[in-house]
Amino acid sequence: MGASIQNKLSICIACYGDDLTALFEAIEKGKENLPSNWTLEIIAGDQHPEPAAKANVWETQFSLLYLHHPNGLGRGNNRNTIARASTGDYLLFLDADALPVDPEQFLTNYCSALINADVVVGGTAYKSGSSSLRHTIGRRKEVIPAHIRTRKPHANFSAFNFAIARSVFLKHSFDESLKDYGHEDTLFGQELRYACKTVTHIENTAYHLDDDSDAEFLDKTDGAIDNLVWLIREGKIDEEVKLFAVYRKLQRTGAVHLMKVLRILLARGIRALLIGGLRSVLLYDLYKLLRMSGHAIKIGRRNF
């Protein structure tokens, strides 16, 4: 009998001054059940001006490579830099505020799926108890079973918790022109679709532990909308993006002019209501459309 094929999984974590101890401990639990023909490495890329106080402890305790970029690289560039530093056959990208729901089986589930897939998305979960706007919106929009995500596999791609063959990623990496928060995974999923890469969705969720205040979350939402507008102008996004599709309908019917007026009249009030404790997904979606209507949007042409 021939020797079994050896595979290596590189866990890639982009962070900004986050305490990654709980995530590393969860990964350690998963290592115990890792198939015998798989090995593991962990790489963290930190863009905070100051190195993590626990960096030396992490490197010793969890045998990880800690990359510090005090001048910042941007979200896409940071992930790409981590990937280039990796030595694995496959990459597992986890956000810094992710925590596997089932740590004992988390890595094994990915290893099994990657044998027959180039890109695998595990899914998002939220712990019960929090009533923050971020968690309310997340539970309604991001907690989607794998069989539902599979219906539109590329549109439902999320960079929060996914694995990919390293060879595929190096050909189709994150767009480094996006420096700030928002829609980098939307663009990445679309690029995979254009490249005819199959995206496989499985039930292998991680909790999203984001603890942003309501105001911080809306600030991030504003930034994400601004990023989306820039992508539209550059011709990098098509109408499979739901918010863009809705906006295009408003443009075609002329209703976008009404939205511009409503933005002046309502946007600040809606923001105050959302920060003040009102938990309405419909109102949040309206807030995003109003933010978008504040831009002069000329649809760019994609250059293939």
Question: Positions of the model-derived regions?
Answer:
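Acidic donor-binding loop at a coil-to-helix junction in glycosyltransferase catalytic cores
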Residues: 180-188
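N-proximal low-complexity "stem/linker" segments adjacent to membrane-targeting elements
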Residues: 1-29, 37
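Conserved donor NDP-sugar-binding/catalytic core segment of glycosyltransferases
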Residues: 99-134
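Acidic donor-binding segment of Leloir-type glycosyltransferases
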Residues: 27-68
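Glycine-rich, basic loop-to-helix element that forms the pyrophosphate-binding segment
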Residues: 55, 69-86
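A recurrent flexible, glycine/aromatic-enriched loop bordering the glycosyltransferase active site
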Residues: 145-164, 180
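Short aromatic/hydrophobic "clamp" motif used to bind/position activated sugar donors
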Residues: 91
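Non-catalytic, C-terminal membrane-associated alpha-helical segments of glycosyltransferases
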Residues: 223, 240-304
